[in-house]
Amino acid sequence: MHKRAIYPGTFDPVTNGHADLIERAANLFEHVIIGIAANPSKQPRFTLAERVELLKTVTAHLDNVEVVGFSGLLVDFAKDQNASVLVRGLRAVSDFEYEFQLANMNRRLSPDLESVFLTPAEENSFISSTLVKEVALHGGDVSQFVHIEVANALTKKAK
């Protein structure tokens, strides 16, 4: 069965937790589209173009992964990409309530779009983009939480 999946997010920045889920999704689905949301309401540290480039670097070794920036409704983006599955990560129980509401809203807007939830590897379960940015902002070493190119980009942004 040919399944195209979308792993959506802001990815500001992409972390090792995200990379772990991307690799596992790439093993589960024939084609995975990393949908990077423009999401100006979040005031991202990195521009959409920068986030796309960082994700392309992190996923360069995965032949069935494509990185695309988008704006607008996720369900519309999924339809444009001919995707039938949304991949979402759940780090903790606290993520579940929001993700459950989001999955139900997406199902209401697009009944054929299925949500699949993956949990991160234990060593990545506490990592969030927000925490990584906070550590980097205060001069901390984030290289154990993100790809080296992402760590370098964060260091440049912090200066």
Swiss-Prot record:
Q: Which Gene3D superfamilies match?
A: HUPs
GO cellular component entries: cytoplasm
Instruction: Report residues binding substrate.
Output: T10, K42, L74, R88
Query: Where is the site Transition state stabilizer?
Result: H18
- Keyword list, A-Z: ATP-binding, Coenzyme A biosynthesis, Cytoplasm, Magnesium, Nucleotide-binding, Nucleotidyltransferase, Transferase
User: Would the keyword Amino-acid biosynthesis turn up in this protein's UniProt record?
Assistant: no
Q: Which positions carry the signal peptide feature in this UniProt record?
A: none
**Cofactor(s) for this UniProt protein:** Mg(2+)
What is the main EC category here? transferase
Q: Which NCBIfam families match?
A: coaD_prev_kdtB, cyt_tran_rel
Name of this chain's protein: Phosphopantetheine adenylyltransferase
Its ancestry begins with:
Bacteria, Pseudomonadati, Pseudomonadota, Gammaproteobacteria, Alteromonadales
